[in-house]
Amino acid sequence: MKALLLARREIVEQYSDRASIVRALFLIALPIALIQLNRSAAGAPDAFILVFALQAGLLPAATAINAAAGSFAAEKEAQTLVPLLAAPIRDIEIVAGKLIGVIAPAAALSIVSLLTFYAAASQRFGAGRIAEVLDPVTMAELFGLSVLFILTLGSWVMVVSARVPSQRAAQQIAGLVLAGVVVGLTAISSVIGNIPTGLIAGGVVAVLVSDLVALQLAQRLWNREEAVARL
């Protein structure tokens, strides 16, 4: 319950900033704009549609980067870190609350983005073709991949945020990560058809292992003694 209350506070603080809302809407609209502006899109192969659907699901998840980047540094600069650490809440509940505050809104944005893309793609490519390419199972897989993406980015950026001296430094790191995400998603379109299934499965397992490592590090860094020592 305490973790959920902390997550609620994180979400309210994150989206009380108008810039955060504008950034989220831009990331939702970007894949839709690209398929509408691409004149050759109507005759594109199914892989083309899947790539843009993947981008539609993953790009809004990048909002999690900024939320996670300020998780420690922002608390320190706002002088709310000590009261938080002094509150009757366990270290694991702090980590869980922060992580839920990162994952929940980004996952919701991914759902909205995928559904919006589905509607726009149906208009562009035809409802019958989109219903076949983006069937419910594929949409669920895209959403699951988005959640994994959010968890991975959120966990590791939270770890980095706990080590930097200021929120500005954390935001700069978040910007670099976001730029890498955009470049990586753009590169997918040229190699997606050549990636073996076994390699994809191995990559997913490696990511899950890295998530566990990041969560363990985050829990250690949010330990009261560790956190107070860095103030």
Model-identified regions with their sequence ranges:
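Aromatic- and glycine-rich beta-strand/loop motifs that create alpha-glucan
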Residues: 1-24, 231
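Transmembrane helix boundary and interhelical loop/hinge segments in multi-pass membrane proteins
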Residues: 14, 65-85
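Hydrophobic alpha-helical transmembrane segments of multi-pass membrane transport/permease proteins
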Residues: 16-40, 51-64, 108, 176-188, ...
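Membrane-interfacial helix-loop-helix connectors in multipass membrane proteins
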Residues: 38-49, 115-143, 195
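A structural motif at transmembrane helix-loop-helix junctions in multipass membrane proteins
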Residues: 71, 130-178
